[in-house]
């Protein structure tokens, strides 16, 4: 016989198990507190964005008149005191509490002035400097008169060109006259006018070959005279040249006396 499980073990309330009822009662409020905390933390995101935006400083832009006043004070002193900065803020109509902006402007202006001096030291010819708003100042042009440079179109340039042309024309006419005189002059006069080559004695050249050639020429022109060679050799000095093949040389000439 099968018994029904649900009829054998009926459902029991929390009164039968008091420990489980306490646990259920404690867990329910925690869930509600978590949900409420999540709902309360959600609207804080826009407040943080507004806080970051409020921490940013607003950029101050000066007009031309204000920049002229600042540059004037900067030329007088690069480190104005507090009273001077406050008076300058009132002069350029800055709102109250913006004196710090003038301090920052002077700091940036001093840094820019140092950079300009460094650039002038590296490039001495460049004297261009710019103001705080980026507009260039008037550049000082070099004195061309002291350098002796004449700009085309000026009276100095025209006078210099005319004098140079006259000098070149005078030199050219003088050269043409010399060429004409040389063409008209006869050849004999030209040869006489040429300088004679100087004969120089060369110590390294020997005079012995010249003396030998002269002596040989004089010897060849004179008639030879007979010379008796037999006086130096005895009559029986030579071998017998004719006769039989078997011959004995005559050695009597070599025998001792």
Curated annotation (Swiss-Prot):
Tissues expressing this chain: Expressed in ASE and AWC chemosensory neurons. Expressed left-right asymmetrically in the embryo, in the grandmother cell and the mother cell to the MI pharyngeal motorneuron but in neither analogous precursors of the e3D neuron.
Key word DNA-binding present: yes
SUPFAM superfamilies recorded: Homeodomain-like
Effect listed in the UniProt record for changing residue 80 to S: In ks86; defective chemotaxis response to sodium acetate and reduced expression of tax-2. About 55% of animals arrest as larvae
Region described as Disordered: 33-63, 113-156
Main location: nucleus
PROSITE patterns per the UniProt record, alphabetical: HOMEOBOX_2 (PS50071)
Any one GO MF annotation of this record: DNA-binding transcription factor activity, RNA polymerase II-specific
A Pfam family annotated for this UniProt entry: Homeodomain
InterPro entries per record: HD, Homeodomain-like_sf
Localization, UniProt: Nucleus
Keywords of this entry: Chemotaxis, Developmental protein, Differentiation, DNA-binding, Homeobox, Nucleus
DNA-binding region range list: 55-117
Biased composition (Low complexity): 33-49, 123-137
Gene Ontology CC annotations of this record: nucleus
GO terms under biological process: chemotaxis; neuron fate specification; positive regulation of transcription by RNA polymerase II; regulation of transcription by RNA polymerase II; sensory perception of chemical stimulus
Role according to the record: Probable transcription factor, acting as a progenitor identity factor regulating the development of lineally-related embryonic cells including glial, excretory and neuronal cells. Mediates chemosensory function of ASE and AWC neurons. In ASE neurons, required to diversify the fate of the ASEL neurons from the ASER neurons. Acts cell-autonomously to establish a neuronal left right asymmetry, possibly promoting asymmetric expression of the helix-loop-helix proteins ngn-1 and hlh-2. In cooperation with the transcription factor sox-2, required for the differentiation of AWC olfactory neurons.
Annotated PANTHER family: HOMEOBOX PROTEIN, HOMEOBOX PROTEIN CEH-36
Complex and partners: Interacts with sox-2.
UniProt similarity note: Belongs to the paired homeobox family.
UniProt protein name: Homeobox protein ceh-36
Organism: Caenorhabditis elegans
Gene it is expressed from: ceh-36
């Amino acid at each position: 016989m099968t018994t029904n499980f649900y009829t054998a073990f009926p459902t029991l309330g929390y009164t039968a198990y008091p420990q489980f009822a306490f646990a259920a009662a404690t867990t329910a409020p925690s869930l509600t507190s978590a949900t409420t905390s999540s709902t309360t933390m959600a609207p804080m995101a826009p407040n943080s964005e507004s806080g970051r935006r409020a921490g940013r400083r607003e950029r101050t832009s000066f007009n031309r008149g204000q920049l002229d006043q600042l540059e004037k004070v900067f030329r007088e002193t690069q480190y104005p005191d507090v009273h001077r900065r406050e008076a300058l803020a009132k002069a350029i109509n800055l709102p109250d509490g913006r004196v710090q902006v003038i301090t920052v402007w002077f700091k940036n202006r001093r840094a820019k002035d140092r950079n300009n001096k460094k650039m002038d030291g590296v490039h001495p010819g460049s004297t261009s400097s710019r103001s705080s708003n980026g507009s260039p100042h008037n550049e000082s042009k070099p004195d061309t008169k002291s350098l002796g440079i004449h700009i085309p179109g000026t009276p100095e340039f025209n006078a210099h060109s005319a004098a140079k042309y006259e000098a070149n024309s005078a030199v050219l006419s003088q050269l043409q006259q010399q060429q004409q005189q040389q063409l008209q002059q006869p050849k004999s006069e030209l040869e006489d006018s040429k300088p004679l080559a100087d004969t120089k004695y060369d110590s390294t050249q020997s005079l012995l070959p010249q003396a030998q050639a002269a002596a040989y020429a004089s010897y060849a022109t004179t008639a030879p005279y007979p010379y008796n060679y037999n006086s130096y050799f005895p009559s029986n000095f030579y071998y017998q040249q004719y006769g039989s093949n078997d011959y004995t040389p005559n050695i009597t000439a070599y025998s001792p006396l």
